Amino acid sequence: MPQKTSETPMMQQYNEIKAQYPDAFLFYRIGDFYELFNDDAIKGAQLLELTLTARNKSADDPIPMAGVPHHAVQSYVDILIDHGYKVAICEQMEDPKKAVGMVKRAVIQLVTPGTNVDIKAGAAKSNNYITAVMPHAAGYAFAYADVSTGELKVTDLKSKFALQNELSALATKEIVVPEELTDDDAGMLKQGERLLSVQPDAEPTSEGSYVSQALTDPAEAAVVQMLMAYLLNTQKRSLAHIQKAVAYQPSAYLEMDQDARSNLDILQNSRTGRKGDTLLSLLDSTKTAMGGRLLKQWLDRPLLDIDAISVRQNQVQDLLDHFFERSELQERLTKVYDLERLAGRVAFGTVNGRDLIQLQTSLDQIPAIQDVLGKLDDGSFKALRSKMDPVSDVAGLIRRAIEPEPPISVTDGGLILRGYNQKLDSYRDAMKNSKQWIAELEASERKATGIHTLKIRYNKVFGYFIEVTKSNLDKIPEGRYERKQTLTNAERFITPELKEKETLILEAQESSTALEYDLFQDIRDKVKAQIKRLQALAAQISSLDVLQSFATVAENSHYVRPTMHAGTHDINVKGGRHPVVEHVLGRDSYIPNDVIMNHDTDMLLITGPNMSGKSTYMRQLALIVIMAQAGSFVPADVADLPIFDQIFTRIGAADDLANGESTFMVEMLEANAALSHATASSLILFDEIGRGTATYDGMALAQAIIEFLHDHVHAKTLFSTHYHELTSLSDSLAKLKNVHVGAVEEHGNLVFLHKMMPGPADKSYGIHVAKLAGLPADLLARADTILKQLEADAPNKTAPAPAPQVEEQQLSLFEEPKPTPKNSPILTKLAKFDLMAATPMDAMNFIFDLQKHLKKK
C-alpha cells in the first residue's frame, strides 16, 4: 500500500507489515487490543459483529478501525478461520514503556484453516489436516500433516480420481500448491471450498530435510519439503514435534470414494452432517482423544492384509475374554490426556503448567496399563508391554518441579514447587520474611499511635503505604509519617524505612517471578527433548484404546468375530444386521438377513416395495465388510468374508444441484466410477440405477450396466431396481440371482416383512406405499384403475419393452381393428428398431421420423 504523506509512524508500520500479508486479516497489537484497519476492519466488523469506528475521524480520509480484546482473540480468530480466511497475529516485541520511538512489532504466527491448533470443544477426536499437492508428469505427489499432533504422511498418486479420493478422505480445508499450477488442477482442488495456498520455490530447510530423509521417491521428498517450508513460514516457531514422513499407498487399504463414504454414513451422517447415527459414533467407546482420532483412521482405511486383520481380531478377542482387565484398562485410559497434542504444545512453546500436570497424570497411568497387558494372553500384548516406555523421567521431573494446581499464566509466578531450586527458595524466603516484617510493623505502629484501625496496604501505583482514617489523624505524632495521598475518608503515609523494605520485597518478587519463568522454560526444554518418546507412547496407547473400544462394543451389541479368507470371493453372512439401524431400533426390533454369494453368484438383483429395506440390506453388507477389515467384530450370527479392495456405491438421489448436476447425471458419474475402477475383488452397491431419466432410457442403461458388470468386471454386486422386467436377466446371466424383500397384503393393507427372499418380487406395491404416505383416497383409487389398465395393455414380455400405451376409455362401437406389424409399415419399423444399441439421440431422431410419417397421414 503506498504511503500517504499524512500517515503517522504507527500507520506506516502497520501498512508495511500488512503489505507482507495481503491475503490475511492483520491483527495488530496496540496495548490490550488487537486492532484491524482499512478493508480488514470493514470486513472484520461484519464477520465478527464488531463496532466499526475510525481513526482520525475529523480528517478528510478517516481510517476504518475495529478491535478485539487480547484475552479473547482466539475466539475471533476461530470465526475467521471457519470462514476460510487467514489471520496474521502481529505482536508488540518490546515493552511499550521501555521502547525508544515506535514500539517494535512483528507477525509471530500466520493462522490458516489448515494450521489452526486451537481445539474447539467437541473436536478433540478430530484431526485438522493440511495437505500439499505437487503435480508431475506421472501424477501427483501428495502429503498431509496435522500440525497439532505432528502426524506427516506422503504418497504418489497416479490419477485425479485417486487424488480426489484422498482429499475427500482427509476432509482437508487447505491445500499447499506450487506456483506452477494449471487452471484445470486448480479448479479440481478448490472443490468443496478448499483454500489453495501457494508456496513459492525455496531452498530446502533443515526441518524439511530431516522429516523427508527416509523417502526414496524424489517427488514425495519434494512435496514434503514444500509443505514443511509453508509450515515454517506460517508458524514461525519450532516444529520439532513433526514426525518423519511416512510413505503410504492408498491401494494397501480398502479404498472408498467420496460417494461411498457419504452414502454409507461412516464418519458423518449424510442427512445431518454430524457424527451422530454413523458407524463411527456406534463404534466409539474410546476413552482418549487420540484413541478417537485413530478409530476414525482405522474406519477410513480398513486393511487388506489378512494377517494384519487377524492380529487385530486376536487382540479384540483377548480383551473381550478378559472383562476385569479390560475394565481396569478403561479406568486408566480415562486419566490419560491427549499426549499427541500435549507434545505439540511443548514443541510450539505454548505449553503451560496445567498442561505439564496433565502430562504427568497421563504418564503416571502407564505402569498400571503395563500390568494389565501382562495379565492378557495374546503374545502381541506381552510384546507391547515390554516395548512400552513409561517416560518416567519426564513424569518425575514434573512431579518435583511443578505445583499440582498451577496458574494458567507462565509469567506471573506460582508455578515452581518449593525445594526445586535453592535460589528461588531464597527469594521466596526474603519475600515471606519481608511481609512478616510489614505485619510486625503494622502491629507496632498501631501500638505506638493508639490507632487500632491503622493498616499497611499495597497497590501498583504507590507501593506500600500506611493508611489512617481521617477521624484518627489527630493521634499521629508530629513528624512521624510523610503524607503521600489524601482520600475522602483517609490519608496515606510513607516512611523511609517502609520504602526501603518495599524495594527489597519488590526486587525479590520480580527476581522470583523472572527466575520461575526461566526455570519453567528449562523444564519445558527438557520435556521437549523427549517428544519422540512421548509420541511413540501416544501411538501405543491410541491403538490399545481402539482395541478395547472394539471389544466393548462387540460385547454390548452381540457381535461375532468374522472369518476372513483369501483366494475366493465367496460371501457367507448369516443373520446380518445393519449396525446403526439396529442400534436405533433396538436389537429385538431389527430383522436380520443373510447374504450368500458363492462362486456361482456375482450379482444379486434386488426387487421389492419402496421402504421395505432394500437400501438398508445393501448398506448392511458394506458396513460389515468395513468393520471386518478394520479389525472389528461384526453384527451377524456368522460372517465368512473375502478381502475387498474397493467399495463403490450409488445409493439415493444425491443431486449436486450446486454444481448444476441433475439426479441422473450424479447417477451416471457414480456408476462410471465403479465401471472404470472396480476389479473382481471390489464390492458394488447400485440402488435404482436409471430412475433419473425416461423409463426406457433408464431400463436400457440399467440392463447394460448389469450385463457389463456381470460379463467384464465380475465384482460382487448388489443391484436393486424397480424395473421388474430386468428380473428375466437371470435366464441369460449365469451368475445373477434374483432376491426380493418380502411383503404381504392383509385386509387391503401392505405389511413389510423386511426379510430377503429368493426370486423376484411379484409386484412393486407402489400404490400401497403411497397409501402409507397418506395420499388422498380418491387419488389412490384413480391410480389403481390406471395401473390395472396399463397392466392389461402391456405386452406379456419378460425383457424390457417399449412403454405400454394407455387406450382411450371410450371407444367407438365401429372402431377399426388395431393395426398389427403385418399391416402397418410404421409398427413394423418400430418393431425392428434396436433400442439397446441406440443412443438417446438416435431414439429421438427415430421418433421424430415416425411423427412426420403419422402427420402426413
UniProtKB/Swiss-Prot annotation:
SMART domains: MUTSac, MUTSd. GO terms for cellular component: cytosol. InterPro entries: DNA_mismatch_repair_MutS (IPR005748), DNA_mismatch_repair_MutS-lik_N (IPR007695), DNA_mismatch_repair_MutS/MSH (IPR017261), DNA_mismatch_repair_MutS_C (IPR000432), DNA_mismatch_repair_MutS_clamp (IPR007861), DNA_mismatch_repair_MutS_core (IPR007696), DNA_mismatch_repair_MutS_N (IPR016151), DNA_mismatch_repair_MutS_sf (IPR036187). Pfam families: MutS_I, MutS_II, MutS_III, MutS_IV, MutS_V. ATP binds at residues 608-615. GO terms for molecular function: ATP binding; ATP-dependent DNA damage sensor activity; damaged DNA binding; mismatched DNA binding. This protein is involved in the repair of mismatches in DNA. It is possible that it carries out the mismatch recognition step. This protein has a weak ATPase activity. Belongs to the DNA mismatch repair MutS family. NCBIfam families: mutS1, PRK05399.1. HAMAP family: MutS. This is DNA mismatch repair protein MutS. The lineage of its organism: Bacteria, Bacillati, Bacillota, Bacilli, Lactobacillales. The gene is mutS.
